[in-house]
Swiss-Prot record:
The keyword DNA-binding applies. Keywords: Cytoplasm, DNA-binding, Transcription, Transcription regulation. Gene3D superfamilies: 1.10.10.200, 3.30.70.980. It comes from Solibacter usitatus (strain Ellin6076). GO terms for biological process: regulation of DNA-templated transcription. Belongs to the TACO1 family. It comes from the Bacteria. This is Probable transcriptional regulatory protein Acid_5948. It is found in: Cytoplasm. GO terms for molecular function: DNA binding. InterPro entries: Integrase-like_N, TACO1_YebC-like_2nd/3rd_dom, TACO1_YebC_N, Transcrip_reg_TACO1-like, Transcrip_reg_TACO1-like_dom3, YebC-like.
Length: 248
C-alpha cells in the first residue's frame, strides 16, 4: 500500500469526524451542479449518479441535492461555475494536480499559485505533470463490508481490473468506461461504497521523507482547504508509519 493511498484513507476519516464535513457539502454541491449540465436524470448520467451517492454518504439533505441538480439543468438560477485543472510540483518534486470549480478563474489562479509558493512548491504550465497520471475509476468500500474474494468476483465480472487493500478500505480501480457498471454491480450486491469518482491516479510514485514529506502534506491540506478546490492528486509516497505520525 502506497503512502498516497493511505493518505486517501486518512482523509476519509478526517472528513467524517471534523469540521471538514461542511467543506464536503460545498464540494459535492458544485460537483452535482456541474454533472447535471449533462442531464438531470442520474440513471442516464453516471457522473451525476456518483455525485448523488457521495452526497448521500455524508448525509446531505435531499432538498440540497435537488436544488443543485436544478441549478445544473438551468431550472434554478446560479452563478456560472467553471472547471479548471492546475498542475504543479510540491516539496521534493512530487507532481500535483488540483481540480477546481470556480466562478472567478483569475482570483482562483492567483490564490492557488500563492498556496504552492508559500508551501514549498510551484505551479507549472498546463501539461507539465498531467502525463504522470492516468484517468481511472476509483471506488472505495469499507473493509468490513466485503471479503476480498467476494469483491474480486463482483468487480472483475463488471469490468474492474484492480483491487487494493488500503487498510480500512478496499480501493476498486477500473477503466473509466467501466465505472458505472462496477458501481451498479456493487450496489446490486448490497455493498456500500464511498466516494465513487473518476480520479487521476499516478503511474509511478515518488518517495518522500523528512521535511519534504511534512511539507508535501502541508501543501496538500492547504490546497484541499481552499473553497474552490474539488480534489487534489499527487504521486507522493510516504512511509506508512511516518505518514500516520505526521497526520496526528
Amino acid at each position: 500500500m502506497s503512502g498516497h493511498s493511505k493518505w486517501a484513507t486518512i482523509k476519509h476519516k478526517k472528513a467524517a469526524t471534523d469540521a471538514k464535513r461542511g467543506r464536503a457539502f460545498t464540494r459535492l454541491i458544485k460537483e452535482i451542479t456541474i454533472a447535471a449540465r449533462n442531464g438531470g436524470d442520474p440513471d442516464g448520467n453516471p457522473r451525476l449518479r456518483s455525485a448523488i451517492l457521495a452526497a448521500k454518504n455524508v448525509s446531505m439533505p435531499s432538498d440540497n441535492i435537488k436544488k443543485a441538480i436544478m441549478r445544473g439543468t438551468g431550472e434554478l438560477e446560479g452563478g456560472q461555475i467553471e472547471e479548471v485543472m492546475f498542475e504543479g510540483y510540491g516539496p521534493g518534486g512530487a507532481a500535483v494536480l488540483v481540480n477546481v470549480a470556480t466562478d472567478n478563474r483569475n482570483r482562483t489562479v492567483s490564490e492557488i499559485r500563492h498556496a504552492f509558493s508559500k508551501n514549498g512548491g510551484n505551479m507549472g504550465e498546463q501539461g507539465s505533470v498531467a502525463w504522470m497520471f492516468e484517468r481511472r475509476s476509483q471506488i472505495f468500500v469499507p473493509i468490513e463490508k466485503a471479503t476480498e474474494d467476494q469483491l474480486m468476483g463482483i468487480v472483475l465480472d463488471a469490468g474492474g481490473d484492480d483491487l487494493r487493500n488500503d487498510g480500512d478500505q478496499w480501493e476498486v480501480l477500473s477503466d473509466p468506461a467501466s465505472h458505472d457498471s462496477v458501481l451498479k454491480a456493487l450496489e446490486s450486491n448490497g455493498i456500500p461504497v464511498v466516494d465513487p469518482t473518476i480520479a487521476w491516479v499516478p503511474k509511478n510514485l515518488m518517495k518522500l521523507e523528512g521535511k519534504n514529506a511534512s511539507g508535501m502534506l502541508r501543501l496538500t491540506e492547504v490546497l484541499e482547504d481552499h473553497d474552490d478546490v474539488q480534489s487534489v492528486y499527487s504521486n507522493f509516497d510516504i512511509d506508512e508509519k511516518e505518514l500516520e505520525a505526521l497526520s496526528q
